[in-house]
């Protein structure tokens, strides 16, 4: 298959002239009114198949966008559109490694950045009709972060004796979020908190013997046909009180909890899923008990964390129809086991709420779980979720596990490439960055998304090349462009390796994407 040798990329830059040399990963503080816009994410090829296993019970159906593997002539394109509106501010202390911390408060969407019609120090060129356009004035969703779960993973082990690999913005992937399980120890969360990581909690089987403080109901059958209790019908206030006590205890040990989920996969009956709710029951549990309890201690409520995109709409509609629950839920979330990319729900953003993907195990590709084929599938899944569903946050399943389920393979004792391609997003598109619209026609097998720091105007471009050969790109930067683009490459032999700076001359820069790679280009403001 013919692979186009190059394609242009237009970046409509902000009014402030960008000067070279500042830290491109410092999200800074955000303080702005609501803003909204629509746009699209360019490119896409879904590579590989997924299944994997989860401790939540048995084999998983494939994650979104499965196919036969990375092919040399992979093709396809994807675009996402939607509106986003939010307000708030972002602030956080510096992380342990000296890099920027995850925001500890809301990072709201700021006012639309103005566009400079003139040319900056490095500008002066003209756009071409075949170019990809990155329009930084067309703001999409605010990025909250990227992370994984430590549920059932125990305390620090050989994987986390070097926590820098997970959370450092200078030595590792710079993950910014951690999902922990109600009832687990806090060892991993304490380590993550040292880096300014946003920690939040999910109950598995609320009210069961697996959740501290609840009665042993594992032999009971609830109205939905699953073993377990229905707290909203039996012990709702007691359960809410237990959750409050657990959150307060975590805070006293140095782990502030950002949000609490109503339940893990309320639509499933997995072996570790001992509480199932109908959509109406979950909304009632939130509106009557969980919402008021969390509001009293300043912790956000998340729901419904369904298994996939097929289950999400029914629960979302039930919460939307329950005035109390709708007012209590700040974050809507789902897992992504089968059933494709999560649906776009513009009413979430327009109501000042956030939309997260909170679990998926993308599994192995052609029997390989540690290398680039599976990593490219994961990167494409992130790209599709961010550009099509306008998600604010994205999570993989386990931090570490045997087989294909963790970012660290405890069998082979290696960090999977999946961790490093997550780092292509998380280390650079920091909490408070805003995705901006992209349009055009990237080469076959290439997907491009872009992000901007509304304070410093640093630009981050993530390019995925799923082809088995290198692919050229010609970036065209209009307005007041950055003077340089610094590439950070993850490929078969590199893990977030910094390359030589690319000079932007007459608004243009030419680059080559290595075969089967994810490269982040950082525009130094």
Q: What positions do the PLM features span?
A:
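C-terminal beta-strand-rich structural cap/linker in extracellular carbohydrate-active enzymes
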Residues: 502-525
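Sec-dependent bacterial lipoprotein signal peptides
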Residues: 1-18
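Noncatalytic carbohydrate-binding groove/subsite architecture in carbohydrate-active enzymes
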Residues: 276-381, 388
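Ser/Thr-rich, Pro/Gly/Ala-heavy low-complexity intrinsically disordered linkers and tails
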Residues: 15-126
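Substrate-binding cleft and catalytic face of glycoside hydrolase catalytic domains
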Residues: 137, 170-320
């Amino acid at each position: 298959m013919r692979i186009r040798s190059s394609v242009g990329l237009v970046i409509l830059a902000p009014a402030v002239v960008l000067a070279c040399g500042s830290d491109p990963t410092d999200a800074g503080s955000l303080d702005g009114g609501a803003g909204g816009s629509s746009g699209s994410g360019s490119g896409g090829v879904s590579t590989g198949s997924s299944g994997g296993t989860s401790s939540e019970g048995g084999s998983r159906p494939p994650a979104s966008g499965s196919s036969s593997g990375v092919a040399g002539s992979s093709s396809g394109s994807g675009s996402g559109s939607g509106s986003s509106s939010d307000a708030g501010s972002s602030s956080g202390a510096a992380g342990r490694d000296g890099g920027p911390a995850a925001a500890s408060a809301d990072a709201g969407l700021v006012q639309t950045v103005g566009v400079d019609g003139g040319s900056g120090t490095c500008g002066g060129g003209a756009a071409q009709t075949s170019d990809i356009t990155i329009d930084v004035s067309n703001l999409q969703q605010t990025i909250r972060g990227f992370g994984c779960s430590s549920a059932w993973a125990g305390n620090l082990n050989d994987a986390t004796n070097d926590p820098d690999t997970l959370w450092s913005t200078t030595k590792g992937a710079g993950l910014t979020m951690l999902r922990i399980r109600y009832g687990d120890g806090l060892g991993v969360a304490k380590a993550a908190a040292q880096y300014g990581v946003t920690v939040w909690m999910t109950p598995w089987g609320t009210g069961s013997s697996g959740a501290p403080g609840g009665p042993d109901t594992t032999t009971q059958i609830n109205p939905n046909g699953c073993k377990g209790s229905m707290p909203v019908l039996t012990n709702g206030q007691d359960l809410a009180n237990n959750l409050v006590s657990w959150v307060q205890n975590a805070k006293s040990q140095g782990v502030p909890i950002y949000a609490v989920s109503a339940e893990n996969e309320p639509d499933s009956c997995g072996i570790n899923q001992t509480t199932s709710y109908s959509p109406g029951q979950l909304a009632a549990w939130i509106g009557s008990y969980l919402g008021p309890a969390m509001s009293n201690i300043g912790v956000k409520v998340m729901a419904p964390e369904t298994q996939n995109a097929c289950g999400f709409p029914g629960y979302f509609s039930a919460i939307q129809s329950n005035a109390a629950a709708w007012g209590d839920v700040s974050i809507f979330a789902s897992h992504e086991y089968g059933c494709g990319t999560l649906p776009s729900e513009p009413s979430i953003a327009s109501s000042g709420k956030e939309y997260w993907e909170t679990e998926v195990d993308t599994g192995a590709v052609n029997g390989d779980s540690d290398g680039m084929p599976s990593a490219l599938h994961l990167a494409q899944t992130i790209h599709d979720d961010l550009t099509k569903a306008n998600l604010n946050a994205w999570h993989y399943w386990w931090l570490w596990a045997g087989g294909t389920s963790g970012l660290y393979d405890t069998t082979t004792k290696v960090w999977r490439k999946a961790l490093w391609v997550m780092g292509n997003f998380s280390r650079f598109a920091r909490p408070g960055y805003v995705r901006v619209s992209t349009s055009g026609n990237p080469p076959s097998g290439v997907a491009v998304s872009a992000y901007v720091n509304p304070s410093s105007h640093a630009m981050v471009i993530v390019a995925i090349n799923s082809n088995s050969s290198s692919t050229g790109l010609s970036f065209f930067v209009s307005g007041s462009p950055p003077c340089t683009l610094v590439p950070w490459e993850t490929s078969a032999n590199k893990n977030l390796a910094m390359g030589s700076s690319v000079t932007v001359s007459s608004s243009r820069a030419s680059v080559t994407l290595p075969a089967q790679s994810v490269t982040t280009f950082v525009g130094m403001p």
